[in-house]
Amino acid sequence: MSKSTFHQTSPSFVQYTHATDKLKPAPHGMNTRGNNLSSMSKNTGQRKQRSKSIHGLPVAPVFYPDKEEFQDSIGYINKIAPIGEKYGIIKIVPPAGWNPPMQLDMNKFSFRTRRQDLHMMDLRFREIVSYDERVYRFFCNLGMELPESFFISNTSIDLYSLMRCIDSHASLSEKELKVHVWKRILRELSIPFTNASLKEASDLYLRYIFPFEDFVRKYQTSEDQCFETDLFPKFFTKDEHSNISIKDQKTSKQFNPETNESVGILQNQESKRNEQIKQQYMPADNFGSNDNHSHNKKRRLSSLSTNNNHLCDNCHKPVNCEVEDTCKEAYCTKCIINPYEFGFETGNYYTLSNFEKYCDNFKKNYFSKFKDSEITEDIVEKEYWKLVKDNNTSLEVEYGADLSTLDQGSAFPSLAKNPVNPYSKDTWNLNVIASTNGSLLSYIDNPVSGITCPWLYVGMCFSTFCWHVEDNYTYSVNYQHYGDTKLWYGIPGDQAERFERAALDIAPDLVKKQKDLLYQLATMINPDELQKRGVDVYFIDQGPNEFVITFPKSFHAGINHGFNINEAVNFAPKDWLLNGFSLNGVLKYQSLLKPPVLSHDMLVYNLATNPASEISVSELRPWVHEAVKRELGIRIMIRGRYDLKEILYRELMEDAENWQCQHCKAFSYFSQVACSCKSITVCPLHIEYLCKCDLSNKTLRLKVDDNELQKLLSY
């Protein structure tokens, strides 16, 4: 099928390959990298783009601009945006002859990797492990050891899957379940219903799941409650808690980190309550017995340290707990109730050359089982998801991610080092595109690493960039300088909420309790699971000398098929502002208490007070009015509630940390509240989170006074 040509007012502004189209085959010998892998030479031959992935995903659009169209990067992207935003991601193949030389020294460029456990990135698996860990912590506090594995009718079962199945057919608050309910539960678990399987399933529920869920249900705290230490009487009933007077709470002695002592009114009460809980949840028979539903194998302790001083083994805050000699660990209520937060561990230091050899050896050894078969993109993708799903196999890989070009230098030529190289000022050079004409990021006061200054990424086979949207819902452009295929998955921006609902359905505990989970860049979800839940997913295979563009609010993720070197940066054409992505991105981050990287108000103010060729007055006016009216409304509200000193504070912007609200993390560009007792500040909406000092010590700092804001309303 031939490429489709789209027309607007000018001839053929874009060439576009449909999802059913294929790219032209690569020249002979260009499907894999050459043998001289340690050299600076690159294989930039065009590779064949698959028409479908192993998941049956359709390929996203691929564009082939001619030399004239390719002259203006932002202009060209603006033209194809109406098509690209329907897919979330697209690929752009430069015209023949465009091939900037990579500037990195393979033997001198050094970096540190991140370690990635393929299992732990998978959202479903992490939900299972998180539940298992929380149950384990609960029973640790009771001095009880858990079996390492559980069985029903010789079928291995994890407590999380059994809990979810019970919860879908009954209530976890019910201690005794009807026989017909157990029949449905076992049927859903594909376990034959017998008297033995009924007893084994019921025993697992009563021994492990019900006690833990009952504890969580009774002592679950709201999201807004603050856990300062575990000395708070978490084991009190509501009535018992109400009997402690305010005076008692204030005068009771607190934990002293120097002496490691915690005494006072709460200590004896909590110790008694711990003993009550042990009696309440301790079964009459031996918990670690070698019965028919579990192995009598001690569960590996999650910490090698002992806990003679009763500090939480996870957060290291004090915890009062009667811990038996058989189990030295103890955990505070917060670390039992809430899922732990997952993150990548740091890996080793490498040069590019050394890492390439390491990656090539790994890939060669791993795929040696395929003997003489060609290692295609399909094979690598299948193996990746097989490894993620296989509970009996654990594989760790390494990834050189988020390597700032401010520190290491870009792989593109730069004007500073290569002033006569034409690629140094090319609009597709990632050092240029963020601040080129047409990108609103040129109106940001200071460079932002990873946003206006590119980052480098060095991949190995199976290394992963997890599902995420770009900071502040901006566009991104990713260029591959060298190496093996980088597989991309993308979702249209208008399906972001559908994606979030799918994630909630897959892992409700994690998503509910970690509001910013999908913004942590540490979560993978199989495209099959997303498609089952009505999410449209597209894919692209990226090779050397190819660009991938992601669109605002588009969740995307991907897998490296081997050693490769990529570079990425963000940019923001005017439609990013005019279509509401700038403001909505800031509001979304504020709701998650997640720090943004850009200030929407600063951008709008700078555009309004400086001539901007990128955007007209009529286009900008609604956004100026929105920002000004919102700020004036906040000032009216604050002045009505509090009697604060006010000063004009023009230096507000010099240090980003000093104008970021310490509660909601949003940039408070026009005004902020400070106190003489500390250096931190908050936005006017969150003055109550600043400190407990008298209002006379607090000041409302204004970067822009009311009169100047009022003048902007006539913009």
Curated annotation (Swiss-Prot):
Residues 422-588 form the JmjC domain. Residues 60-101 form the JmjN domain. One of its GO terms (biological process) is regulation of DNA-templated transcription. Residues 32-44, 252-269 have a biased composition (Polar residues). It comes from the Eukaryota. Fe cation binds at residues 468, 470, 556. The keyword Metal-binding applies. One of its GO terms (molecular function) is zinc ion binding. InterPro entries: ARID_dom, ARID_dom_sf, JmjC_dom, JmjN, Znf_C5HC2. One of its GO terms (cellular component) is nucleus. Residues 21-53, 247-271 are annotated as: Disordered. The keyword Amino-acid biosynthesis does not apply. Pfam families: JmjC, JmjN, zf-C5HC2. This is Jumonji/ARID domain-containing protein 2. It comes from Schizosaccharomyces pombe (strain 972 / ATCC 24843).
